[in-house]
Amino acid sequence: MSDKQFIETQGQRLYEALRSARTLAPLTDNHPEMTVEDAYHISLHMLRLREASGERVIGKKIGVTSKPVQDMLNVHQPDFGFLTDSMEYEDGAAVSLKAAGLIQPRAEGEIAFMLKKDLQGPGVTREDVLAATEWVAPCFEIVDSRINDWKIKIQDTVADNASCGVFVIGKQHTDPASLDLAAAAMQMSKNGQPAGSGLGSAVQGHPAEAVAWLANTLGAFGIPFKAGEVILSGSLAPLVPAAAGDRFDMVIEGMGTCSIQFTE
């Protein structure tokens, strides 16, 4: 497909939905022929509009990596998107749903990677990722969809910047060489009650494997990972709906804690 006007029109529609905190019908309803590559270019146009408004790219994310999340969303391959400085909040922050423009947020517990070296696919391996990583930390990614009722296909979520909302990273930073990331156990609670658990192996067998996949996928588009960027590696457990008044806490074995709460 890859019609320039189509790409720009859909990117503009998603950007306006983001800014006005409203949802759209799935793009694939009216454009079933749309490809994942089309969707990626739509997300890039949306990103350029965000950058033009003053936002700065600080990292990248992979999503829909674990089977529970794939089954929940009925999307059976990973998605990918970009993180900007406006999405990041401090660990423990009280996030206003209105100020953050969140519409139908869901919480994900995952592992964040901070890079100390550039990486560019193709050919990036798990070992390359670990060698290029300065530290890992627990992370809450709050995903949000500009698509009605999360009725997404892979093309819809990629176009919508991988359903990115906001994120917080725990204050404890750990050298990944000291950890078995595949065996790292995550426990998440919502308002003091258990809300999810999972192992690092839930994410493509190993979180660094997911990061390598992302490096190679973006490498095909000529997009590198850069030193100083943060990479979110995907949820270790099913997504949990979030609303005003909710507080989420997480602990990952050997990595420390992370928390976020929500207000109107």
From Swiss-Prot:
It catalyses: (2Z,4Z)-2-hydroxyhexa-2,4-dienoate + H2O = 4-hydroxy-2-oxohexanoate. Pfam families: FAA_hydrolase (PF01557). Its EC number is 4.2.1.132. It is an enzyme of class 4 (lyase). The keyword NADP does not apply. Gene3D superfamilies: Fumarylacetoacetase-like, C-terminal domain (3.90.850.10). InterPro entries: Fumarylacetoacetase-like_C, Fumarylacetoacetase_C_sf, Hydratase-Decarb/MhpD_sf. Keywords: Lipid degradation, Lipid metabolism, Lyase, Steroid metabolism. GO terms for cellular component: cytoplasm. One of its GO terms (molecular function) is 2-oxopent-4-enoate hydratase activity. It comes from the Bacteria. One of its GO terms (biological process) is steroid catabolic process. Involved in the catatabolism of testosterone. Catalyzes the hydration of 2-hydroxyhexa-2,4-dienoic acid to 4-hydroxy-2-oxohexanoic acid. Belongs to the hydratase/decarboxylase family. This is 2-hydroxyhexa-2,4-dienoate hydratase. It comes from Comamonas testosteroni (Pseudomonas testosteroni). The gene is tesE.
